């Protein structure tokens, strides 16, 4: 099993798809990496040679921020927004939508389950 950036790639998938299992690599970036490495995107992971795997690993480590480093950078960006107290930071802190979506209805994913208020008894 090929292990790149701390992720075990699924053996039965095409390399182009398998690389997307790494956080920070999508389909277009996967194609870009394979072109640089000179690997056929239709090759299955189990059919990759050790040389090809090491070439892919080297390209990803050198040129792209993936997995832990990328997660850390995103977390630091959000923390910075919170620390400077800007609108986006406040929305992150309150757990509300950040990009201007409506909140009177919807926004349940961001706000969590409804907190129902009991009706006043007579």
UniProtKB/Swiss-Prot annotation:
HAMAP family: Ribosomal_uS13. SUPFAM superfamilies: S13-like H2TH domain. Pfam families: Ribosomal_S13. One of its GO terms (cellular component) is cytosol. Belongs to the universal ribosomal protein uS13 family. Residues 97-122 are annotated as: Disordered. Located at the top of the head of the 30S subunit, it contacts several helices of the 16S rRNA. In the 70S ribosome it contacts the 23S rRNA (bridge B1a) and protein L5 of the 50S subunit (bridge B1b), connecting the 2 subunits; these bridges are implicated in subunit movement. Contacts the tRNAs in the A and P-sites. InterPro entries: Rbsml_uS13_C, Ribosomal_uS13, Ribosomal_uS13-like_H2TH, Ribosomal_uS13_bac-type, Ribosomal_uS13_CS. This is Small ribosomal subunit protein uS13. Part of the 30S ribosomal subunit. Forms a loose heterodimer with protein S19. Forms two bridges to the 50S subunit in the 70S ribosome. It comes from the Bacteria. GO terms for molecular function: rRNA binding; structural constituent of ribosome; tRNA binding. Residues 101-122 have a biased composition (Basic residues). One of its GO terms (biological process) is translation. The lineage of its organism: Bacteria, Bacillati, Bacillota, Clostridia, Thermoanaerobacterales. Keywords: Ribonucleoprotein, Ribosomal protein, RNA-binding, rRNA-binding, tRNA-binding. It comes from Caldanaerobacter subterraneus subsp. tengcongensis (strain DSM 15242 / JCM 11007 / NBRC 100824 / MB4).
């Amino acid at each position: 099993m090929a292990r790149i950036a701390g992720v075990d790639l699924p053996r039965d998938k095409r390399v182009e798809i398998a690389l997307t299992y790494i956080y920070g690599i999508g389909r277009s970036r996967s194609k870009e990496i394979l072109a640089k490495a000179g690997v056929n995107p239709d090759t299955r992971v189990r059919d990759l040679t050790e040389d090809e795997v090491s070439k892919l690993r080297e390209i990803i480590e050198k040129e792209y921020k993936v997995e832990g480093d990328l997660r850390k950078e995103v977390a630091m960006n959000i923390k910075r927004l919170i620390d400077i107290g800007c609108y986006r930071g406040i929305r992150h802190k309150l757990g509300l939508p950040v990009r201007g979506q409506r909140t009177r209805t919807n926004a349940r994913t961001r706000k969590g389950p409804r907190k129902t208020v009991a009706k006043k008894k007579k």
